[in-house]
Amino acid sequence: MECDKNMSFEDCELAVLRSAVDKIEKQTGRKKIENPEVKEIINIVEDFLKKTQRICYGGTAINNILPEQDQFYNKDLEIPDYDFFSPNALDDAKELADIYAKVFDDVEAKAGVHYGTYKVFVNYIPVADITYMNKDLFNAILKESISVGSILYAPPNYLRMAMYLELSRPEGDTSRWEKVLKRLILLNKNYPLHGVDCLNMNFQRGFELENKEKET
């Protein structure tokens, strides 16, 4: 990173520092993702998702249903953290942890902060967040889910709803808002809402029936 002539000394220092941080993070991320153990960890959770047909949501889901040019995660540098819904969340957490325990020594499955959510860690790496979802609701979302590489992801409208909900809570974690909005813009770009123009709809029949009911 070269400093611009118009930069102050302090701004130049910051620019050099940011460039160094980016370089180090890329090197560290590449080392992690190329580690055979990390590759095995990712393969196991992805195979579990393919087998059980659970529905992924969250950042990884948004990223993976976007076209490659709009994806915000660099798969060569970042370890995916899968969040997924399950009608049997506790059992899934136990089963996934048992699968990992056959291969790795440091495996932990524990309850999350929110009721009905369970976290699975392998070698201190967060691998999965499993959230309970009522079976009827799960099946309804399942019908509109998107399959990418045999892994199911929540439909765009559900992901969109979750992001709008987060942006509507000023007493929540506002430090995430900028990141959430960037993702929302990308989702809306690739999966735009198609509204109905109410001005072109004919409501006359409905009004006629309503008037007849009042007369009787």
Specify the residue positions occupied by each region the protein language model found:
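Charge-rich, solvent-exposed alpha-helical interaction surfaces
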Residues: A20-K23, I99, V103, R183
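Active-site and adjacent loop segments of nucleotide-processing enzymes
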Residues: L49, I130-T216
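Active-site nucleotide-donor binding segment shared across nucleotidyl transfer reactions
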Residues: V38-N88
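Generic detection of long, well-ordered alpha-helical segments
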Residues: K31, N35-K39, S86, L90, ...
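Conserved catalytic core of two-metal-ion nucleotidyltransferases
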Residues: D98-N139
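N-terminal regions immediately upstream of nucleotidyltransferase
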Residues: M1-E40, C198, F207, K214-E215
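Short, conserved charged micro-motifs
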Residues: L90-A97
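Short amphipathic alpha-helical segments
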Residues: Q69, A97-D98
